[in-house]
Amino acid sequence: MTEEYGLDGIDIDWEYPTQKSAGISCSPEDTHNFTLLMRDLRKVLGKKKLLTCATIASGEYIDFGNCIKYIDLVNVMSYDMASPPKHHSPLYASDISGWMTTDAAVKKHLEKGVPHDKLVVGMPFYGRGLTPYKAYVPRPQVLTGVEEKWSAESQVPYMTDKNGNFVLGFENVKSVTAKCHYIIEHDLRGAMYWEYADDYEQGDLRTAVAQCLLPNEQQGTRGKKESQ
C-alpha cells in the first residue's frame, strides 16, 4: 500500500499494548508482540520507508530497548495527561498541572532508551474542560464567556470562571511556540499535533509551529527564539 499510494511510511497508534483502556482486547504478551510487529513491519517496509509510533506520555507498555532500532520516530502523546481542574498538556509542573508534563514525558522516553533525535513532541489543538464545557473543546470554541489566564510555570493558557476557578485548559500561539522552543533547545526531532481540524480555519496554531520549527530558507536552520 505504501508503494501503491506513494506514502512516506506507516504510523502505529496502539493504545495501549497490554491495556484495555481503548476498549480493545489485549494480552500480557502485547509488549513483546509490539516489538515483533515493529520488527516485521520494518522487514516489509525496508530502510527507505518511515515506521513511526504513537506512545503514551509516560512511555509505558512498549519495550523501547528492544524495538527502537526498528522505529524512525516516536510521537509522544503529551496531552490528555490530566483531567480538569488540571491542565491536560502543561509544558512544566505547576499548581494547575498533574504529575505528568510534556517535559516529564520527554525525560521518561529518554530514560527508556528513545534517542532525542527520534522524539517528537505532541501538542493538542483542543481543550479539556469542566461543565458547562464539553470534555473535548476544539480550539475555535474556546474563547467564550470566561477569562483567559496564563501559567508562567506551566507555559500554557487556561480559562477561569467569574470566581477564578479553573474551567478549561487549552493551547494558544504562545504555548505551542514555547513547546517548539523546548524542542529546539533539547535537540528533539520535531512536533506533531492532534488535530488539524481543531485549529482555527486560518491555522493560527499550525502556522506558529511551522514558523518556529521548519528550516529558515535563508539561514538553513530552525527558527530562533525571539528575545524577551
Whereabouts are the PLM-identified features?
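Short, acidic/polar
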Residues: M1-E3, A57-G65, E171-I184
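Receiver (REC) domain switch/active-site residues of two-component response regulators
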Residues: D8, D72, R189
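Active-site rim elements
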Residues: Y92-I96, N163-E171, M192-A197
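Conserved active-site loop/cleft motifs that coordinate metal ions or position small ligands
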Residues: V120-G122, G190-E195
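Substrate-binding cleft of extracellular glycoside hydrolase catalytic domains
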Residues: M1-P17
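Substrate-binding surface in catalytic domains of secreted glycosidases
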Residues: P17-Q141
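Glycan-binding loop/region signatures in secreted carbohydrate-active enzymes
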Residues: M123-Y182, A208-Q228
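Short acidic, glycine/proline-enriched helix-loop-strand junctions
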Residues: S25-N33, K47-K48, Y200-K225
